[in-house]
Amino acid sequence: MSERIIKWGFIGCGEVTKYKSGPAFQKIENSEVVAVMSRNGDKAKTYAKERGIPKWYDDAQELIDDEEVNAVYIATPPSSHATYAIMSMKAGKPVYIEKPMAVTYEECCRINAFPKKRVFHVCCVLPPLFCLLPKGKVTGR
């Protein structure tokens, strides 16, 4: 039985995907980055070439519609998170969203309401806050 491979499409080619979360996607077992998107096509092309990613786009809908992409990572400015998340879910793709999930409560509600119409996985990146606490300061409250 073959394992299912998550074939990621990144929407956003900034610092987060270059140095923080992005590199991990290519190191995790059964995870592969197959496409990236930036509104600046030259930036997307360079990013893809430097990292051995086979496809690049300058239009989010084209990346979302790519049949090889089976999950979408959204690492854009927060003002576009809700739009890209809903576009991805409409295409039937699970979504992993950088924090914050959206910029308003209403946008968060729109994202959360969508999965009720279908079965979806929506996940937002959250820092492990316990790591930020000084050692020995956890009181159990």
What does each model-identified segment do?
Residues 51-114:
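Beta-loop-alpha module in the N-terminal Rossmann-like domain of NAD(P)-dependent dehydrogenases
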Residues 21-23, 45-49, 84-87, 109, ...:
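Short amphipathic alpha-helical segments
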Residues 1-51:
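N-terminal Rossmann-like dinucleotide-binding module
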Residues 17, 57, 97, 122-124:
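Hydrophobic residues in well-ordered beta-strands that form the structural core
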Residues 102-141:
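A contiguous active-site-proximal alpha/beta segment in oxidoreductase catalytic domains
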Residues 28-30, 91, 117-120:
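Short helix-capping segments at alpha-helix termini
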Residues 7, 32, 68-71, 94, ...:
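Structural signature of beta-strand start/N-cap positions in the alpha/beta core
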